[in-house]
Amino acid sequence: MGVANDSSPEYQWMSPHRLSDTVILGDCLYFNNIMSQLDLHQNWAPSVRLLNYFKNFNKETLLKIEENDYINSSFFQQKDKRFYPINDDFYHISTGGYGIVFKIDNYVVKFVFEATKLYSPMETTAEFTVPKFLYNNLKGDEKKLIVCAWAMGLNYKLTFLHTLYKRVLHMLLLLIQTMDGQELSLRYSSKVFLKAFNERKDSIKFVKLLSHFYPAVINSNINVINYFNRMFHFFEHEKRTNYEYERGNIIIFPLALYSADKVDTELAIKLGFKSLVQYIKFIFLQMSLLYIKIYELPCCDNFLHADLKPDNILLFDSNEPIIIHLKNKKFVFNERIKSALNDFDFSQVAGIINKKIKNNFKVEHNWYYDFHFFVHTLLKTYPEIEKDIEFSTALEEFIMCTKTDCDKYRLKVSILHPISFLEKFIMRDIFSDWINGRN
């Protein structure tokens, strides 16, 4: 019997470091460093006391605060040029359907609420185990095109996040009502609140008020003002009406430069590309080579990411050429950045079972499912592709679909093209800038 290690499918079932009913996978030092900066047990006084607190303020007292010179620039939205993280805090950068993401220093920390009644903690580890397994088994530079988490904590009590969200929501509600001279109430209409918040969030006067009230009312090193509307949509979504925000996972990643979808023409040129379309070819080619190399591994021809799209591809600095050999060709990337696949939450490979994906798919799929979805999302994100007739025409070979076999860009039928389809595709002159080191 072989010894299970992190390059084997059995790695996900090993018994790692345990803390009571929690489990840590990966580097405990990284994980404990982050956890030491979080207060998972922070509580606040009942909301009625917060309401009574705001009764001490009116338009005139708020105006005096606005006239104050002090401003905490970390309460601007992060896309605002005035934003600056002046504190060593956790800054909210994204909330999607499956996770709430913060950055602190050079780390990214992702909190994922898990449906504990459907899955055991060890059945929710794909986001850590799949990329780690692939990284340890791939032999060439293609392994650099994968984002591996540094650590993952399973089955942690995450109720503090929902409690924090509610506290900030109530603070914003009462602050806006006071600014407008309205009667104070914790009742709200989602549409009315979001409109009022979005109208004010970029105002320097509003940021001055947040600079005063956030430390006084929230008193937390977790700043959720940035992209708060995304967090609002997550917690207020009707499908989570009866959701128990109890337990879940905490995952720690390296901090990327950008996600691939954030690159526009100006940034593409700044990064060294001749055009935005050349940049798109670059990320498409690197992802293609990664998939081809994965499918070369023994027993890995069942690999699925299940969510291959531009915002799940991250960009990192690349300090040396990336060279990937395929048959008699050599692909050389001298760019100062590299793309890397992230977010393996719904992925599967070899013998690593992922019940989440198993429950979602009714028919068999392979790499083509991912690239069909990838091309659809590329064309939606970057309409500029259409200007390159040769490239856009070639990409259409991946999306020969109809409404009966494709729903929201995802295949509903089983189309199992061999990986050789992708191999032949990237040998075309479309990618000549990188073939045999021509760039």
From Swiss-Prot:
Main localization of the protein described in the UniProt heading: host cell
GO cellular component: host cell endoplasmic reticulum; host cell endoplasmic reticulum-Golgi intermediate compartment
GO MF term (any one): protein serine/threonine kinase activity
Database matches in Pfam families: Pox_ser-thr_kin (PF05445)
Active site: 307 (proton acceptor)
Residue span, Protein kinase domain: 87-439
Highest taxon in the source lineage: Viruses
Compartment(s): Host endoplasmic reticulum; Host endoplasmic reticulum-Golgi intermediate compartment
PTM: Phosphorylated in vivo. Autophosphorylated in vitro.
PROSITE patterns given in the database record: PROTEIN_KINASE_DOM, PROTEIN_KINASE_ST
Enzyme nomenclature, EC number: 2.7.11.1
Stated family: Belongs to the protein kinase superfamily. Ser/Thr protein kinase family.
Biological function: Essential serine-protein kinase involved in the early stage of virion morphogenesis.
Protein name per UniProt: Serine/threonine-protein kinase 2
